[in-house]
Design a protein with these regions (language model features):
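Conserved substrate/cofactor phosphate-moiety recognition/catalytic segment
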Residues: 15-63
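Conserved glycine(s) of the Walker
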Residues: 12
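Glycine-rich phosphate-binding loop used to anchor ATP phosphates in small-molecule kinases
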Residues: 53-103
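Small-molecule kinase domains that catalyze NTP-dependent phosphoryl transfer to phosphate-bearing small molecules
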Residues: 116, 120-163, 174
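Short, amphipathic alpha-helical "lid/cap" segments that border enzyme active or binding sites
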Residues: 58, 62, 157-168
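Conserved phosphate-donor/acceptor-positioning beta-strand/loop module used by diverse small-molecule
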Residues: 96-118, 150
Length: 174
């Protein structure tokens, strides 16, 4: 099982992943960005604005996740924004072909809530603000593609993690 936490930059995916891991025995956080960091020095001569645009990134994310799940026997929690529909489908298809069940969670909120959260954190503020428009453009299909949409606007990080844990079959008491 892989729980994929999607949403715009600054929506709380990483915090949710860490809280969810604490709630779910036999789970671990897998950060797909580490695959991008591995590719960066190897594809330095192939400039892209985001490593998700490198064609090898997507199948390597799926393969890495599948191998980690197979090796550890644990559920994976992946906090990763993916705003390109074809990219997400490519990754999820690879995960499913490797035998993993995918549960796609979208952490969502209105623009004013997201901007307030982003302004409240110095970490990557400009990057996060610059990508809000991309999230808004993808929001409709993301909502349709998600197994669970969580409005983070009025929930604490613990409440978000609890809601996810209860909604994912086989993870929580729900």
């Amino acid at each position: 099982m892989i729980v994929w936490l999607n949403g715009t930059f600054g929506a709380g995916k990483t915090v949710t992943a860490l809280r969810l891991r604490a709630l779910v025995p036999g789970s671990r956080v897998f950060d797909p960005e580490t695959v991008g960091y591995m590719l960066q020095p190897n594809l330095a001569d192939h400039a892209v604005s985001d490593f998700q645009h490198w064609p090898p990134w997507r199948p390597l994310v799926a393969a890495t996740a599948a191998e980690l799940a197979r090796y550890t026997g644990e559920h994976l929690i992946a906090p990763q924004t993916v705003l390109v529909h074809d990219y997400l489908e490519e990754i999820f298809t690879g995960l499913r072909m490797a035998g993993l069940t995918v549960f796609h969670v979208l952490l969502d909120a209105e623009d004013d809530v997201l901007r307030r959260r982003i302004h409240g954190s110095d970490e990557a503020r400009e990057w996060r603000l610059a990508h809000l428009a991309g999230y808004r453009a993808a929001r409709t299909w993301l909502i349709e593609a998600a197994d669970l949409v969580v409005d983070i606007g009025v929930l604490t990080p613990d409440e978000v993690a609890n809601r996810v844990a209860c909604a994912v079959p086989g993870l929580g008491p729900g």
